[in-house]
UniProtKB/Swiss-Prot annotation:
It comes from Thermotoga sp. (strain RQ2). InterPro entries: DNA_mismatch_repair_MutS, DNA_mismatch_repair_MutS-lik_N, DNA_mismatch_repair_MutS/MSH, DNA_mismatch_repair_MutS_C, DNA_mismatch_repair_MutS_clamp, DNA_mismatch_repair_MutS_core, DNA_mismatch_repair_MutS_N, DNA_mismatch_repair_MutS_sf. Belongs to the DNA mismatch repair MutS family. This is DNA mismatch repair protein MutS. Keywords: ATP-binding, DNA damage, DNA repair, DNA-binding, Nucleotide-binding. ATP binds at residues 589-596. The keyword Glycoprotein does not apply. Pfam families: MutS_I, MutS_II, MutS_III, MutS_IV, MutS_V. GO terms for biological process: mismatch repair.
């Protein structure tokens, strides 16, 4: 195949982006060649053609984002190569450059994103310590976490629902195994070596300004270098890194996030969906962050609660505030798109509309005394009003973006175009008079431009200044110096309008960039205002109460599960009292009775209080917990090659390693993944260790042997779920009371589940026979005892 200059250019650029699909702009299309073309054709279901024996597939430039989204979702990295000069102005080969590398974690376009964060994670490891830097390129948020605990790192990666992992080569295979559905890319070590990247990105004189460890600084440097590589720019929109530290926030492992159904996942209804009545995208993202990182500082928690209480107490102003917030747009992402030169005219309209709301919001804020006055750039509002159409059509350069009156020069060119048809009509009339040809017609087509058309019957009347341009079957087409001059002016006006709109739009965007810091601070303040007002709205809507904090007392009166109550009629409220003297609760009772719901609701009420929310209870006095741990349910870990029981023991090992006297531990059926004897022994030993540890524990179990703990340890109290029997019917009241379950009601639960009557009747026969045999052998007559006791009474 003969290599043309164009193909040489393509191959040279492709060499620099071997690991990406290269979309190469050719006129009105982005073309892919060779293997890239085959992939594009298959993924996008478009025709594969050939150009000089090279496989080729193309997509229209105006539909790029639609096709790009499909390629990225299919797991491909895509390099966009654009024409850097107008074809009409270049007689040589057009200069082309890659302007963007698109990966799942580097997307900023609105149509690609949901309201939630789109996190990329850069992961590094050095001498047994792990560092993860999370970045949402679309908002500029940067979070840093460092730990010597590999599982804690994996938990955070799972909790943040990351879209992309970037890591050192030696971590790539293990991370791919753990997160098979996440796009994972390895980078060379030199990404981690240039700490000057941090200084330049944040304009720092001293790199230690952030108080990050050497490993964290290296990982942050790698993130910065990678974002520069994908966005093809030195000017980044990155906020100062926020350290995820146990000193400030409760660290939640992924099991707890999943077991308590905190955020959307595989388990359907969740706490975030219940609480998320936010009015802004920024607020929704912040609420999710608060749920994943509850506070551990009592003063900070109480400040949030006080703000929520003030909002609850002024419902009229609260409603007004939320009405205004509902018109606030995603300022955070708009600023990011402007910074990366990816904004569209509607972004600037949305920004203006948001800024116009701020004075009205400030009036309402003065009623509360909770929030500071919102600062915003008034001069920018004025500029956006004058510059950008209220309803811009198309992109800059298409003549419908910049307002009339903003640029007198642009208005002149527009006037010329708008009156072109009128002037052509005048010219046509003048030529008809001059030539005496009444059927003379002035027209235009894209190939020949403007022309005068005369039928062949009238050719003897044409003046000397008519220059033949095209011959048709029944007529001839001509041009005159005057018409040629008019055409030149029109073409120049069209070109100049396109250039000027692009230039003016860019200049307005540059003005927006100058106000970046103020706009990002405004976005932060609006998000916080939205979350606090949402928590107040939730408190009113769901009848929540303000929690009070105590050093060691956990007292909940009329507690409810915030998620289950939303989807259940007549939810049964329950009480719990724990302190340092009585801090370990063993809960027995049959399946379906509500044991799991009860212990989860205690965890959720505690967590909600620590994000600054009112809670579903009549009264709540709570300690501030440093961690909430859960071990619930039976599940295996196929990706990690772990059985159900091994997963259970791994999670218990984490709890025994990390829990303190300030932790809340929620256990459901620990020890059920092995034999009964082994299970009871392990559960008893774990209970002893947790009692010594001093943490507050709620342990739901079918092992009635564990109720004997109360006789050995004064810290233990037994609870059960009240069950009523009416004839052959069993009623689960879901009410937690003092005491021990006297039977399991397993057959009754099977009956409720729809097991056929013949199977149920046979189960009763077997149960009766087994207990007769057991009574003869042991001399005991407790027909309903669930287990043979292992420990002496």
């Amino acid at each position: 195949m003969k290599v043309t200059p164009l193909m040489e250019q393509y191959l040279r650029i492709k060499e620099q982006y071997k690991d990406s699909i290269l979309l190469f702009r050719l006129g009105d299309f982005y073309e892919a060649f060779f293997e890239d073309a085959k992939i594009v054709s298959k993924v996008l279901n478009i025709v594969l053609t050939r150009r000089q024996d090279a496989p080729m597939a193309g997509i229209p430039y105006h539909a790029l984002n639609t096709y790009l989204k499909k390629l990225v979702e299919a797991g491909y990295k895509v390099a966009i190569c654009d024409q850097m000069e107008e074809p009409s102005k270049s007689k040589k080969l057009i200069r082309r450059e890659v302007t963007r590398v698109v990966t799942p974690g580097s997307i900023v376009e609105d149509e690609f994103l949901s309201e939630t964060n789109n996190y990329m994670a850069v992961v590094s490891e050095e001498k047994g310590r792990y560092c993860t830097v999370f970045c949402d390129v679309s908002t500029g948020e940067v979070l840093v976490h460092e730990s010597s605990d590999e599982q804690e790192t994996l938990d955070l990666l799972k909790n943040y629902s990351i879209s992309q992992i970037v890591c050192s080569e030696h971590l790539k295979s293990s991370l791919r195994e753990r997160f098979p559905g996440v796009y994972t890319e390895s980078i060379s070590e030199w990404y981690f070596s240039d700490l000057e990247e941090v200084e330049k990105a944040y304009n720092l004189k001293d790199i230690h300004h952030f108080e990050l460890s050497p490993l964290a600084l290296k990982t942050l440097a790698a993130l910065i270098k990678y974002v520069k590589y994908t966005m093809i720019t030195e000017d980044l929109n990155l906020k100062p890194p926020l350290l995820i530290s146990q000193r400030d926030y409760m660290i939640l492992d992924s099991a707890t996030v999943e077991n308590l159904s905190l955020i959307p996942g595989d388990r359907g209804k969740n706490l975030f969906d219940v609480l998320n009545n936010t009015e802004t995208p920024m607020g929704a993202r912040l609420l999710k962050k608060w749920i994943l990182h509850p506070l551990v500082d009592r003063k900070q928690i109480e400040e949030r609660l006080e703000a929520v209480e003030r909002l609850v107490n002024d419902r009229v102003s609260l409603e007004e505030m939320r009405n205004f917030l509902s018109n606030v747009r995603d300022v955070e992402r708009i600023v990011s798109r402007v910074e990366y030169n990816r904004s569209v005219p509607r972004d600037l309209v949305a920004l203006r509309e948001t800024l116009e709301i701020i004075p009205k919001l400030n009036e309402i804020l003065s009623n509360f005394g909770v929030f500071n006055k919102l600062a915003f750039p008034e001069e920018l509002v004025d500029l956006l009003r004058r510059a950008i159409e209220d309803d811009p059509l198309g992109s800059p350069g298409e003549g419908k973006v910049i307002k009339r009156g903003f640029s007198p020069e642009l208005d002149e060119y527009r006037d010329l175009l708008e009156h072109a048809e009128e002037r052509l009509k005048e010219f046509e009339e003048k030529e008809r008079e001059r030539t005496g040809i009444q059927k003379l017609r002035v027209g235009y087509n894209q190939v020949f431009g403007y022309y005068i058309e005369v039928t062949k019957a009238n050719l003897d009347k044409i003046p000397d200044d008519y220059e033949r341009k095209q011959t048709l079957v029944n007529s001839e087409r001509f041009i005159t110096p005057e018409l040629k001059e008019f055409e030149t002016k029109i073409m120049a006006a069209k070109e100049r309008i396109e250039e000027m709109e692009k230039e003016l739009f860019k200049s307005v965007c540059e003005e927006v960039k100058k106000h970046k810091e103020v706009l990002l601070k405004l976005s932060e303040d609006l998000a916080k205002m939205d979350v606090l007002s949402t928590l107040a709205y939730d408190a009113i809507l769901y009848n929540y109460t303000k929690p009070v904090f105590s050093e060691d007392r956990l007292e909940i009166k009329g507690g409810r599960h915030p998620v289950v109550e939303r989807f259940t009629q007549n939810f049964v409220e329950n009480d719990i009292y724990m302190d340092n003297e009585k801090r370990f609760v063993v809960i027995t009772g049959p399946n379906m009775s509500g044991k799991s719901t009860f212990i989860r609701q205690v965890g959720l009420i505690s967590l909600m209080a620590q994000i600054g929310s009112f809670v579903p209870a009549q009264k709540a006095i709570l300690p501030v917990f440093d961690r909430i741990f859960t071990r619930m349910g039976a599940r295996d870990d196929l990706a990690g090659g772990r059985s159900t029981f091994l997963v259970e023991m791994n999670e218990m090992a984490l709890i025994l390693l990390k829990s303190t006297e300030k932790s809340l531990v929620l256990l459901d059926e620990v020890g059920r993944g092995t034999s009964t004897q082994d299970g009871v022994s392990i559960a008893w030993a774990i209970s002893e260790e947790l009692i010594k540890r001093g943490c507050k524990v709620l342990f739901a179990t079918h092992f009635t042997e564990l109720t004997e703990l109360e006789k050995h340890f004064p810290q233990v109290q037994n609870k059960t779920i009240l069950v009523k029997e009416e004839g052959k019917n069993v009623i689960f009241t879901h009410k937690v009371v003092d005491g021990v379950a006297d039977r399991s009601y397993g057959i009754e639960v099977a009956k409720i589940a729809g097991i056929p009557d013949r199977v149920i009747n046979r189960a009763y026969e077997i149960l009766e026979r087994n207990f007769k045999n057991h009574t003869k052998k042991n001399g005991k007559s407790n027909r309903f005892s669930q287990q043979i006791p292992l420990f002496p009474v």
